[in-house]
Amino acid sequence: MPSSIFGKEKKDSLILPRIYAYSKYHQPYSDTLVDNVYLKLRFNVERRNPTLWIIPSMYSLAKGERQYLRETYNKIEYTNIHDYDIIGQVKAGTIRHNRNAMPTLMDLITPKIYDEALYDGYVLSPFNRANKRLYKYRQTTNAAEGTTRIDFKPKLYNTQLLNGYAIVETETGRILKSVLNGEFDMINFRTELNYSNKGGWFILPWRSSTAATFNFVGNRISTNILSVHHCRSELPDSIQWAEGKATMDTLRPVPLTVEEEELYEKTEDYFPAPPSPEDSVAKKPNILKKIFWDTIGETLVTPIRAESEQAYFRLSPIVDPLAIRYSDSRGFSYKMKLRFQYTFSKHRYLTLNPYFGYNFKIRQFFFDAPLRMIYNPKRNGYAELTFGNGNRISNSTVAEMIKEEFGDTLDFTNMEMNKFKNAYIRAYNNIMVFDWLDIESGLVFHRRHAVNEEMMRRYHMPIVYTSFAPMIGIKILPWEKGPLFTTTWERGFKGIASSNISYERWETDAQWKIRIPGLRLLNLRAGYGTYSHREQNYFVDFDNFQETNLPDGWDDDWTGDFQLLNGSEFNRSNYYIRANASYESPLVFATWLPYVGKYIEKERFYLNSVLLERSRPYYEFGYGFTNRYISVAAFASFKCNHFQRVGFKFDFEIFRRW
């Protein structure tokens, strides 16, 4: 007779604890596992409109045929069950130029069913002990087969949860088969996974099939995905992204259907029709159209990628809504990123990861270009050279000196007399002396140019200030996953490289990210900075305490950053003492709201405080949430226990993982 468990399991049932413990005590072999995986995706464009053109990776499906096929043969290298690399070796298909459409579908074929999150930090697994409180379970035992079927569903509907069932080996708790129904990044899916009984692979799937549907602004695309693991054909590591149906025919572990063969047969990329002479003139307009839409158009809305055995290059799309940022104090900005890596050997490679963008509030172009040579990855040894034009910096002393000489009646409001553009060069080396200690040393050069040159000349003030300084930094990580302590010293000297500023600065900082079961995260940060020597009150420029005019997203700088504090406040203080804390968790308060709560993926609470020379104490309280579309946060600031103002910040999250 079937037995049931709702919400909390009965004391006489051990099936759920066996599942929780199975992956812990049955890890794969310690040696690196290598698997060959065949993947087949079939797309059916049911409805589409012009908005499909601007969705990353969907450009190739925005026109032409409505059914497409894509096949890949891949090598997966598992370092452990949580960490693996997918290396594409052969690809074929009917999508133009063999483009990869909807890359987020790749996450669906290898869910980490025993982890807290199934898909790289998203969707809470029902088979992890930390998430048990979020699901209801029903158990049905088949004594004859020695298996148990466990049906699960969420206690509260949310895109971070799913429903389905699993067939489990009753005696051991090993999952033999699972069916998952849910939503992930605007994709509704149903995935069926069959798990291997082969030694060393028993907690990994050997075959999976997924039916997925993408709906967005009237566009509807359905996809069927088949993945087959443990394929016998072995390819050399030197083969990466070879193209051709003929090659795929020799590797494919399952035959194509009649409909799939027909898709290949009518694809011009594989069976081009020779043009007749009389058609040549008539096709010229189509060639121009192809150049415009396929070359220029695709470059605008999709990332530009290039990859070889030694080099990798990626530029974010030129037209990308994800690049738009807004904060109440910094205004709107648009930001792009470039990633480049060149590998000389396994232990030596060069990276260039610049970002550049435009801040509309102050109408200025910004960039930061770090060029890094990694020469000893094992000891975190690298040399880095960074060019940038940074954020504008205030110099309140300039206005004070002018008023002292020419009279207090002068009004410099809205004249940007104290604003300077900041260009810089940093050159330094980092090395891990011990497993818990890093030391970096180098040189820093700043050139600060007045924004209002005319007014500076009128009052006989310098237009350009330069500084040259050696620096030393120490990073201490006492234990793995513990707090990171840093101390930096920087000393500016006059007369070197036209430097006209002398100073000495010390800063200490401590940061700790404490991960709590259930995808919860507690961020703690504290820091102190001061100038031990300074001839004039020029350019208070702390490394760990400054505003940025090109802010990044939810996962980058929303924690540990002051959102409403005016830059002029900390640009005229000789010291700062700061403390920041934030708590992040899925399924807190907003999840319970009707209609919209099911789309809230994570929530975050902020508390920021700082003591400054002329502004103490200063507090910020904040609340934010993120989902598949957008991240939003609201902040309230208080100065000397008096309310100041409220501000907001948002980023687009839509298609961030595409």
Residue positions per predicted region:
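Transmembrane beta-strand segments that form the barrel wall of outer-membrane beta-barrel proteins
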Residues: 152, 175-182, 210, 313-326, ...
